[in-house]
C-alpha cells in the first residue's frame, strides 16, 4: 500500500433515529442511520404481514359467495 493516500480508519459512532448508539470501524467519525437491530421489526418480533386480496376474493366476500 502506498503511504499517504489511504484515509484514516478508526472508531466510528453509529447513531440510530431510535436513540441507540454503538461503535464500529469506519473512515468517518459519526454515522447516522434510520433503523438498527434494536428497532427493526425483524429483530424486535413486531413484524406485520400484509394480506393482499385479489378482486375475485373481494367480490366473493362482498356478496357472500
From Swiss-Prot:
Cofactor: Zn(2+)
Cofactor: binding details: Binds 1 zinc ion per subunit.
Keyword ATP-binding: no
Pfam families reported in the protein's UniProt record: Ribosomal_L31 (PF01197)
One MF annotation (Gene Ontology) recorded for this entry: structural constituent of ribosome
GO terms, biological process: translation
GO cellular component: ribonucleoprotein complex; ribosome
Keywords: Metal-binding, Ribonucleoprotein, Ribosomal protein, RNA-binding, rRNA-binding, Zinc
Residues noted as binding Zn(2+) in the record, renumbered to the chain: 16, 18, 36, 39
Quaternary structure and partners: Part of the 50S ribosomal subunit.
Function field: Binds the 23S rRNA.
Family: Belongs to the bacterial ribosomal protein bL31 family. Type A subfamily.
Protein name listed in UniProt: Large ribosomal subunit protein bL31
Species of origin: Carboxydothermus hydrogenoformans (strain ATCC BAA-161 / DSM 6008 / Z-2901)
Gene that produces this protein: rpmE
